[in-house]
């Protein structure tokens, strides 16, 4: 199959297994959920009644004071007491096989082509690390919410995009399923397309 290049005459011949396969929604969902789960810190921690600071002595005798009976100042119903079901640090990551991960990326890229959300260009760069220059370039291409993928990160382009909320610049090694889905359009250079094909082959 062929992908038409926006800034040059002609088209780029690409593999149908990477850019023309059916959309596997279940697989994409599983991989996206696993990717998001892997990004969770999982470091929250609370103290149980056994871990909270304080004496183990009974605050007052069982009977005769007129007050409600109490056995510990560390009880969860007391102020500064422990937490009943205290949260502990945990690993939220989910296992995803390489074949599944690659399959999900191929599925997403194919769907981007079908929806005309993937734009292939010969080259994408700016002359200086100025946000103004990048905004102007994107305006000419009628792009606003966009992920730009190059075969290697251009420092000028990276610095120019850093201050734009709806624009991100990545190299091929930095692409992930969540980013590919999150942006309205994805711009890829011809070299990046070839590199993606090699990576997912």
From Swiss-Prot:
Q: Name one GO biological process term.
A: translation
InterPro entries documented for this protein: Ribosomal_uL4, Ribosomal_uL4-like, Ribosomal_uL4_dom_sf
Keyword set, alphabetical order: Ribonucleoprotein, Ribosomal protein, RNA-binding, rRNA-binding
Instruction: Kindly give the Pfam families that the UniProt entry links to this protein.
Output: Ribosomal_L4
Q: Which SUPFAM superfamilies does this UniProt record tie to the protein?
A: Ribosomal protein L4 (SSF52166)
User: Which cellular component terms (GO) are annotated to the entry?
Assistant: ribonucleoprotein complex; ribosome
One term of GO molecular function: structural constituent of ribosome
Q: Could you confirm whether the keyword RNA-binding appears in this record?
A: yes
Gene3D superfamilies tied to this protein? 3.40.1370.10
TM ranges: none
| Region feature Disordered, mapped onto this chain | 44-71
Task of the protein: One of the primary rRNA binding proteins, this protein initially binds near the 5'-end of the 23S rRNA. It is important during the early stages of 50S assembly. It makes multiple contacts with different domains of the 23S rRNA in the assembled 50S subunit and ribosome.
Q: How does it assemble?
A: Part of the 50S ribosomal subunit.
Q: Which family does it belong to?
A: Belongs to the universal ribosomal protein uL4 family.
Put simply, this protein is called: Large ribosomal subunit protein uL4
What organism does the UniProt record list as the source? Photorhabdus laumondii subsp. laumondii (strain DSM 15139 / CIP 105565 / TT01)
List the taxonomic lineage. Bacteria, Pseudomonadati, Pseudomonadota, Gammaproteobacteria, Enterobacterales
Corresponding gene? rplD
